[in-house]
Amino acid sequence: MTEINKQSLKKLEKQILRKTAQAINQYNMIEDGDKIMVCLSGGKDSYCLLEMLLLLQQKAPIKFDIVAVNLDQKQPGFPEEVLPNYLKTKNIEFHIIERDTYSVVKRVIPDGKTTCGLCSRMRRGILYDFAEQNNITKVALGHHRDDIIETFFLNLFYNGSIKSMPAKLLSDDKRNIVIRPLAFVSEKETLEYSKLKNFPIIPCNLCGSQDNLQRVFIKDMLNRWENNNPERKNVIFKALSNISPSQMLDKELFDFFNITKDDIRR
């Protein structure tokens, strides 16, 4: 690595680490004594997540453990040795779970259709089961700011709902707390960090599934907006934490029904 790249890496790492720490603090993601399961896919974002948590583990005033977990779904061409070899250099506890979900998905989903939805649901269930069985207190996912914004627009445009990915949530089955420490970090930052660190990236399309065309459309739309109006993504992201229920139409969030003439002050 050249001296220039070393300086770039140092600056970028500090920047990402600061944003990660801010997100963790603002949403109380990690507590003293936690056992954090980092879900490692072999993609740039999960590598970045693991690196940031390992750095914070050294600096934080509290103690917490980190367990890296990868789910080998038996996709054809999956390089089984890549993640174990990488994780051994980190001297941390790690587990490779082997489940042939690939065959199940291929049997259920017609050829040419996107398999990501079913695949992700099966993967989530397996990882949640592992977390419960191994006394994991928090499940850490590598979703970043752009993922959160894109999910907001996917729900807005295609589901008719105002929702996204929270930085922290209790899973639907109430068995696990899920955290997203990279919530304040942009995809541009994780991509550049991955290149500078030279992570051993595992392709995400080994299954042969087509990209979700709706997500591709949303991503392209947001990138065009950002090119025309820099900081647009930051403004949208800020809006997700600046919501006024009384200015919306959801009767579950605000009691419109009981606003009456008796409330008028003159």
UniProtKB/Swiss-Prot annotation:
EC number: 2.8.1.-
Subcellular location, record wording: Cytoplasm
Biological process terms in GO annotation: tRNA thio-modification
Cofactor: Mg(2+); [4Fe-4S] cluster
Main location: cytoplasm
Keyword DNA repair carried by entry: no
Binding of [4Fe-4S] cluster, residues: C116, C119, C207
GO molecular function, one term: magnesium ion binding
Function: Catalyzes the ATP-dependent 2-thiolation of cytidine in position 32 of tRNA, to form 2-thiocytidine (s(2)C32). The sulfur atoms are provided by the cysteine/cysteine desulfurase (IscS) system.
Note: The thiolation reaction likely consists of two steps: a first activation step by ATP to form an adenylated intermediate of the target base of tRNA, and a second nucleophilic substitution step of the sulfur (S) atom supplied by the hydrosulfide attached to the Fe-S cluster.
UniProt-recorded name of the protein: tRNA-cytidine(32) 2-sulfurtransferase 2
Source organism of this protein record: Francisella philomiragia subsp. philomiragia (strain ATCC 25017 / CCUG 19701 / FSC 153 / O#319-036)
